[in-house]
Structure formats: C-alpha cells, structure tokens
C-alpha cells in the first residue's frame, strides 16, 4: 500500500516507536487531524464501563484530562460505543442530541463534531473526538480521521489496564 501525500499514517506509526508514549502519539494525532480536517478541540477518551474517561485534551482548562462522562446508556453511546459507528454532528442540533454538556461546548464556539470509535476485539475501547465551528465537518471528513483510530489501540488498552489496577488497589 502506497501512502498518499496527505496521509499521515506512516509518520504516526513511526511516532509509536519513540519514547514518551502515549503523550507523544496523542500530540502527533492532534496535529495530524488538524492538518487533515481541522478542529478547535481534540479529545481522546477510553471506555471504562458506562463511562468514558479523558486521557488527552487540546483544551485542558475546559476539558481536563481524567475527566469522565457517563455515556454508555445514551443515544450517543448506543451509536458510537455499542454499534461502533462514527458520529458526525454537523450543527448545534447534533451537539445537543449527543452531549449533556452542550452548553459548555457551545460556549466555546463549537457546533460540529466527529466522534470515531477506536475498535479492538469487536468492541469500542475508546473514542477520538474532533470539534469545530458549526457546519465545519462533512461526510468526507470522517473516513480520513477514522483511518487513524487503530493507532490508539495500545494506548487505550494501557489506560484501561492502569485504571483497573488502580481500582483493584483501592479495594484492598
């Protein structure tokens, strides 16, 4: 397979071999997705039961790392986490349908979203999330971002394992 000139997959794969993981990969994905389709907010969340837990945010003041949302039993959770389908919200109505924190999202000037499930062993283990101004994203923007999602599998498995180890240690 020959990489297209605008396909960052090769350089991102090389990033995985570098020291400083997973933060180095997260930052590289933030930059790659900004170049591909643009965004004003980029977050990464891994699945932990009915919750999603944030491991990366391009705007940590508003969306801090380690923040959590209960999303499993929502229409968005049904679509993205259970049915393992990307979500494209083109406008504020889509944002309001998907997220209980839509007021904060809208206050940041954001009105469109792409959520890509990160899939492993038949399950969604996390999501890659890009937000921008209303009507910024179109159908054609989903596939280039989705191609990058498998790069997050090792980092999300590690984050989930670390969270479970912490939970076990707290029970003792």
Each predicted region: which residue ranges?
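GAF sensory/regulatory domain recognition
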Residues: 44-64
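Juxtadomain coupling helices with adjacent low-complexity linkers
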Residues: 132-172
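A short, aliphatic-rich beta-strand micro-motif
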Residues: 112-119
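Sensory-domain boundary capping and coupling elements
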Residues: 119-132
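Amphipathic alpha-helical coiled-coil segments that mediate homodimerization
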Residues: 8-15, 21-44
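Regulatory sensory and allosteric helical modules in signal-transduction proteins
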Residues: 47, 62-97, 106
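Signal-transmission linkers at sensory-effector interfaces
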Residues: 1-18, 168-172
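Short hydrophobic/aromatic beta-strand element in the GNAT-like acyltransferase core
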Residues: 41, 102, 115, 127
